[in-house]
Amino acid sequence: MTQTEIQQGIKILFDKLTIAENNRLIYKQLTELCGIDKQFECVLKKSICFWKLTINSLCFSIITELAKIYDEQKDAFGIKKLINISSQNGDWFSKWYNENGVLHKDFIKQLEEKYNSIEKKREKLKEIRDAELAHNDRKNILNTQSIYDGFTWGDIEDLIETANEIINRISISLTGIEYIIQLRNYDDIHCLIKNAYKGMHNIDKLNN
């Protein structure tokens, strides 16, 4: 692969990471609202099917986008391939010799160690993508602790943070570009819940 192709691959990986992180934050906001906001509880009880579809859709998106990022299949461009190609092309990363005093082999080794440190979480992610999501109708919605058995939201956060670190360290050393996750539509959920609550309140007043 050329440097241009690697840069394009990095951008695609980060776009997937942004989707996963934004959906995780929206899911987190929903779970927090469920615990403290009576308005949300009221809306949830009135439209349980809608919210179950919404929550399952968020979970599915988070899992699938992360699974693409950590895909190690030969024809996939994931974090592992990004590390391997970077390892094979040390001359692309001259900045690490001149500016930071870190040898290329040490820089790549650090990223490989970081990647290997989350092996069990990566394996569980793949397992869920391949098997569990086909039966997500059986799962409880708005679970603040875990998504599926043995796989927690803390694991999701760790996978996102690790991917973010590896992608950006390679991108910065290759091009000087740092990618920042931009929050998208994060406030929409509050507006949706408040408007739904107002609508139900007005209907109740009319019925009475």
Question: What is each stretch, according to the model?
Answer:
Residues 1-121, 146-208:
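Amphipathic alpha-helical interface segments
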